[in-house]
């Protein structure tokens, strides 16, 4: 928010959230309540209008560890509810959701799995 405040032409500003980074930084997002609270706080502090994309991945590490270790969808500590909430949230409909998981051979399976959650 401090950086955005300093930018004169805010139409050129965008933010990308990474699901594993969010969890590693200490933001719990795996329950309906924590998901709503985290994105409510994001909107209040930064502004949801600045969210232009999201990196989608599971995490090998728990909340607050400050360790970024991406995992395949459904294979880490995130749980499928998080991904279901993202896929069903209309705010993300026209936003790039970039799969950033470690096993290339699983990408097509993971993409199909995410679409089935919609």
Go through each PLM region and give its residues.
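A short, acidic, amphipathic alpha-helical segment used as a generic capping/interface helix at domain edges
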Residues: 36-45, 77-89
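Acidic carboxylate-rich catalytic motifs and surrounding loops in phosphoryl-/glycosyl-chemistry enzymes
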Residues: 55-58, 99-103
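Generic structural signal for well-ordered alpha-helices
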Residues: 1-4, 39-40, 80-84, 111-115
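Active-site-adjacent loop and "lid" segments of alpha/beta metabolic enzymes
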Residues: 68-75, 86
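Short active-site-adjacent structural elements
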Residues: 61-66, 95-96, 105-109
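Acidic/histidine-rich catalytic cores of soluble enzymes
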Residues: 1-71
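Charge-rich, low-complexity N-terminal segments
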Residues: 87, 95-98, 102
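C-terminal helical cap(s) of enzyme catalytic domains, especially alpha/beta-barrels
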Residues: 104-118
């Amino acid at each position: 928010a401090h950086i955005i405040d300093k930018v004169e032409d805010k139409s050129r500003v965008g933010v990308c959230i990474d699901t594993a980074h969010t969890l590693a930084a200490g933001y719990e997002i795996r329950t309906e309540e924590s998901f709503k609270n985290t994105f409510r706080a994001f909107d209040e502090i930064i502004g949801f209008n600045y969210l232009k994309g999201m990196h989608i991945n599971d995490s090998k590490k728990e909340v607050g560890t400050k360790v970024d270790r991406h995992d395949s969808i459904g294979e880490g500590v995130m749980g499928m509810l998080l991904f279901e909430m993202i896929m069903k949230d209309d705010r993300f409909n026209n936003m790039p959701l970039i799969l950033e998981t470690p096993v290339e051979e699983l990408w097509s399976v993971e993409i199909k799995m995410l679409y089935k959650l919609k």
